[in-house]
Amino acid sequence: MSKHNWTLETQLVHNPFKTDGGTGAVSVPIQHASTFHQSSFEEFGAYDYSRSGTPTRTALEETIAALEGGTRGFAFSSGMAAISTAFLLLSQGDHVLVTEDVYGGTFRMVTEVLTRFGIEHTFVDMTDRNEVARSIKPNTKVIYMETPSNPTLGITDIKAVVQLAKENGCLTFLDNTFMTPALQRPLDLGVDIVLHSATKFLSGHSDVLSGLAAVKDEELGKQLYKLQNAFGAVLGVQDCWLVLRGLKTLQVRLEKASQTAQRLAEFFQKHPAVKRVYYPGLADHPGAETHKSQSTGAGAVLSFELESKEAVKKLVENVSLPVFAVSLGAVESILSYPATMSHAAMPKEEREKRGITDGLLRLSVGVEHADDLEHDFEQALKEIAPVSVR
């Protein structure tokens, strides 16, 4: 088998930077230099100042480009730095369509920052192709997708939205944080820019803040690099190295966590104290078939709704294994409360319209044994009086 046909899990370990050419070290060197000596007065080398690029950052950027099937990758200081830099492609008077139940940080960026610069926005149900089509305006320049969405796991038909975008001269951005290239490759489906909070599954250990982007079109890549260099929200070399290390185990971590997530979703679905479960791996999820057509797995994030905020509080106080925290995608399971965590920036009325109620919890499943997690939730849910009988 040629290296071009290697499976993803092999590519993750055996990337082009797996050994250092000068020393043979089985690790990417961390180049802490902020500036680089130029041996020629007339012709500079590949690196001059670390904001513009470093060998360590190049290793990460080329790796994410290859994993996503792109021509160019970009490493940023956070997921929101990646998203914000991509939005710099917009100009005053432009309009952007955004998934209605988008991540709270993106919601804040769109509603509180882009509006100050005269950039219009419309939140739409991206699962409804007709609504997307009706919402496109003459000045719409970007359609921004999350699929699955955060935190209600809505599924967008990527190809359908890409087709609408191309018919109307729009760029498409897609936040691929939940899926990663291990489960979904948006560039192959026609998306222009794929974005990641690499803080999450890509690094996978709750120990680094980082963002990544990848593009297939080389001209768009040049434009995005110019903005990355100008805006300057780039990833430091130590953090680049941590993400590169985390990537090596992405496939095994995600496979394990996804299997457990499926089991827990089915467990929650049957439990009388749980009103609703959001997970695309469930047969009755409205986007299940669409998701299967464009991805290779349901992922390791699910959300479930309890009767009230009081029920949520009781569960959180009685569960033992998951950490109660913001973020997701780590080796440890993370239980989050979107109303006061990921979507705290969203007004309550807007949250509730999107199904992000005071009873909603999001669970990022880690690599713990499935039996232990299920037993932990089972004992915690016993503290909550059943609200329905299935």
From Swiss-Prot:
N6-(pyridoxal phosphate)lysine: residues bearing it: K200
Transmembrane segments: none
Recorded coiled-coil stretches: none
Gene Ontology cellular component annotations, sorted alphabetically: cytoplasm
InterPro entries linked to this entry: Cys/Met-Metab_PyrdxlP-dep_enz (IPR000277), Cys_met_metab_PP (IPR054542), PyrdxlP-dep_Trfase (IPR015424), PyrdxlP-dep_Trfase_major (IPR015421), PyrdxlP-dep_Trfase_small (IPR015422)
Catalytic activity: L,L-cystathionine + H2O = L-homocysteine + pyruvate + NH4(+); an S-substituted L-cysteine + H2O = a thiol + pyruvate + NH4(+)
EC numbers, comma separated: 4.4.1.13
Factors inducing expression: Up-regulated at the transcriptional level when sulfate, cysteine, cystathionine or homocysteine are the sulfur sources. Repressed by methionine.
Top-level taxon of the source organism: Bacteria
Subcellular location: Cytoplasm
PANTHER family attached to this UniProt entry: CYSTATHIONINE BETA-LYASE (PTHR11808:SF50), TRANS-SULFURATION ENZYME FAMILY MEMBER (PTHR11808)
Subunit structure: Homotetramer.
This protein's name: Cystathionine beta-lyase MetC
Gene that encodes it: metC
